């Protein structure tokens, strides 16, 4: 490990993933690769508030540390506050980490996080970096350029293999707690629901959101044609969205679930319908059939559903992948996907036989 170190020398490891919930979930196979070797080590996850939700449902993680990284503040919501950053350095310094492993996606720089760990006195600092890191990184990996790019689950494993950790199966890890399962059961009992379809219309960027009026039509027709209730989920800031999408036939749950309870609901859904957002990866981790309405923001080969029955809906446009958070030209990549196509994909997955996890992996 780390160029010849014995596992016993790596007692306290900081795992860093500073972007969103789905990105962190896609890195859990790499966390598992580390845990399988460092069975007794303390593994802490430094992540965004949403990323820490993944850490809390990953048995390989011992501690989560919330950090609002300025390098990920794409909407400029964080006030400039050097004191806040120095306090973050002190929090890490107090924990006396032996090593930090920094995970990033394509187009992200590992160097802001590397500098944070450098200031915190963490002696070993590893990441993949296209940029020259100087002494900010003690172990630098150069990711291989591939077209099309590999799935994001494999990117983290490429870094851990570079560091000497044996490969593991690229399966995401997400385990709801007992209280999450109980919360999901209460919601279903409250609404008299057993078998159901789950629709999650929100996304962290507007460029990845299928139009709400189209989702509303999808919900209405799925309920009519399948005879199943349709749960429409969303976060606290999405109550209006879920209510609008649910209409008079769906069950709006915007802001009514914790992430753990939401995860448990996804795990029980007959089929999940969503955008290219974290919910796609939650469904993949739990081996639930998923329809992903995929915007042209990112390569679908890299960010689409993984090892689960799925229908990946893509409308090709010349501007894809744009990597934009707001579409400046009319969302043709999404408006080009007809609601009937979404409905047909969901009904097709509903008609597929129920599969075990192993069977789902073989099909995918």
Language model regions located:
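Catalytic machinery of carbohydrate-active enzymes
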Residues: 1-364
């Amino acid at each position: 490990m780390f160029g010849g170190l014995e596992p016993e020398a790596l007692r306290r490891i900081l795992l860093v993933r500073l972007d969103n919930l789905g990105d962190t979930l896609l890195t859990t196979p790499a966390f598992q690769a580390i845990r399988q070797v460092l069975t007794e080590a303390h593994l802490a996850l430094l992540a965004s508030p949403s990323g820490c939700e993944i850490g809390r449902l990953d048995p390989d993680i011992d501690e989560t540390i919330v950090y609002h990284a300025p390098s990920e503040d794409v909407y400029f919501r964080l006030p400039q506050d050097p004191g806040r950053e120095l306090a973050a350095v002190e929090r890490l310094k107090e924990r006396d980490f032996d090593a930090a492993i920094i995970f990033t996606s394509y187009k992200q720089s590992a160097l802001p996080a590397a500098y944070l760990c450098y200031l915190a006195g963490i002696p070993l600092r590893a990441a993949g970096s296209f940029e020259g890191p100087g002494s900010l990184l003690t172990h630098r990996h150069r990711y291989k350029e591939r077209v099309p790019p590999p799935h994001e689950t494999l990117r983290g494993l490429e870094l851990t293999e570079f560091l000497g950790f044996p490969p593991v199966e690229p399966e995401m890890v997400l385990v709801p707690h007992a209280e999450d399962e109980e919360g999901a059961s209460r919601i279903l009992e409250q609404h008299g629901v057993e078998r159901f379809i789950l629709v999650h219309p929100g996304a962290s960027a507007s460029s990845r959101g299928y139009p709400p009026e189209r989702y509303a039509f999808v919900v209405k027709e799925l309920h009519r044609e399948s005879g199943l209730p349709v749960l429409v989920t969303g976060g606290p800031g999405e109550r209006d969205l879920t209510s609008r999408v649910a209409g008079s036939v769906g069950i709006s749950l915007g802001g009514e679930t914790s992430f753990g309870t939401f995860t448990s609901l996804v795990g029980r859904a007959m089929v999940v319908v969503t955008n290219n957002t974290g919910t796609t990866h939650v469904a993949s981790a739990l081996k639930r059939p998923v329809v992903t309405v995929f915007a042209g923001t990112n390569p679908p080969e890299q960010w689409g559903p993984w090892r689960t029955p799925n229908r990946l809906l893509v409308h090709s446009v010349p501007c894809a992948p744009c990597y934009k958070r707001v579409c400046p030209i009319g969302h043709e990549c999404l408006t080009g996907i007809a609601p009937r196509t979404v409905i047909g994909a969901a009904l097709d997955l509903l008609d597929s036989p129920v599969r075990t996890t192993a069977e789902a992996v073989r099909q995918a």
